[in-house]
Amino acid sequence: MEIAKTVRLYDQDAYATKFEAEVLACEEVEKKEGKVYQVWLDQTLFFPEEGGQSPDMGTIDGIKVLDVQIKDEVITHTLAAPLAVGTMVKGVVDWKHRFYNMQQHSGEHIFSGIVHNRFGYDNVGFHLSDSIVTMDFNGVITAEDIEKIETEVNQAIIENIPVEVSYPTKEEIKVLEYRSKIEIEGQVRIVTIPGYDVCACCAPHVRRTGEIGMLKVMNVQSYKGGVRISILCGFRALEAFRQKADIITKLMAQFSTNQEALVENVTKLKNTNQTMKNQLASAKQELMEYKVAAIPEDSENAILFESDLDTPVVRNVVNGLVEQFTGICAVFVGNDESGYQFIIGSKNKDCRQIAAALREKLSARGGGSDKMIQGSVAASQLQIEELLATL
C-alpha cells in the first residue's frame, strides 16, 4: 500500500490544535493489548515520535490517538477504533501536552546551544518524555559550570527572545553553522534562538523564550565518557518543584525542624539507624551462637530454623556449623506459610546433590558449589527435616 506524504500542519502553526483531514487508509492491527487501527490522513497537526521527542496526544473524530509515528515522511496515527476511508475527519491535539513538550524542547535548545558554544560539545543523545528531558553530551561538564549554564538559560528565558524557524536553501545551508543531531536529507528546518542556538529541528517550539517559563537541572550523571543531564522546563518544572516542596514540608514537620537543618537531621537518623542495625546484627549473631552451642556434639547434621535472620549472619552460622559437624549444616529462615530462604554447607557431603534432592522433592530453587548452596523453598519445616534426614 502506497500512501502519499503527509502534510505536516504543525510546521505551519505549532499553536493550532484543531484541523480537518481526509482519511486515506485504515488498517486493523493486532497488538499485545488488543486490536488497534492504523490511520493515514492527507494532513495532520499531530507531531509524531521523532527526534527523541514523545508524540502528540489527542483525538480524531472523538477517538483517542494512542500513538503517532513517521516513516519516509508518511505519518501513521494509531487509534482505538477505525475510521472510514474517504471521509473527512476532525482532529484535536491535546494542547496542554503539546505546549509542555514545546517548553521542554525550546529550553533544551538553549541549554545545548550554550554548551556547544562554550565547550564545543555536542548533544549526542536526546530524549523528551512526559516526565523528564535527558541530554547526553560528549564531554565532561563540572557541577559549577552546569549551575552557570542553568542560570544563563533562565536569563535567556527572561529576555523573551523570539524563536525563529526558517528553511534555508541548499546554497544557504552550505555556509550556515548549525547544530544537528543526525544527518539530514532533503529540506532542512532550522530553529534559531538568536545569541544562543542555531539547530536543525523538526519539532514544534514556542514563539518566544519567555513562554518556556523556567529551566531546572534535575539530575547529572557521568555517561559514556561525557555527562547526562536531566532537565525540566515550564509547567513540568513547576510541578516537580511542588512535589519536592511538599516532601520537604512534610519532612520538616516529622523532624520538627527547619529546611536548613533537615539534611543534618536525616543524616543523624540514618547514622542512628545503621548503629541500631549493627547492634541488632551483633545480638542475633550472639543468640545464634547460643543456639549452635545447644546442638548435641555427637549430632551428624546441624539444622536450624529461624523466623528472621540477615543473610550475612546466616552465612557465618553455617560456616561455623561446618567446622563442628560432619553432616548437613543448614539454616532456614522464614515460616511454613511463606516458605524459607536457606544456606546449606557441608565438608563431607556434596551440596549440589542436596540441592538436586530439594528441587526434585520440594521444588526448591537455588544452587551453588559442592561445599555450599543457597536458595529458597516453599515447604513446611517438617517436610524439609524429613527430606534432609534421608540424605
Walk through the language-model features, giving the residues of each.
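A glycine- and charged-residue-rich anion-binding loop/surface
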Residues: 1-391
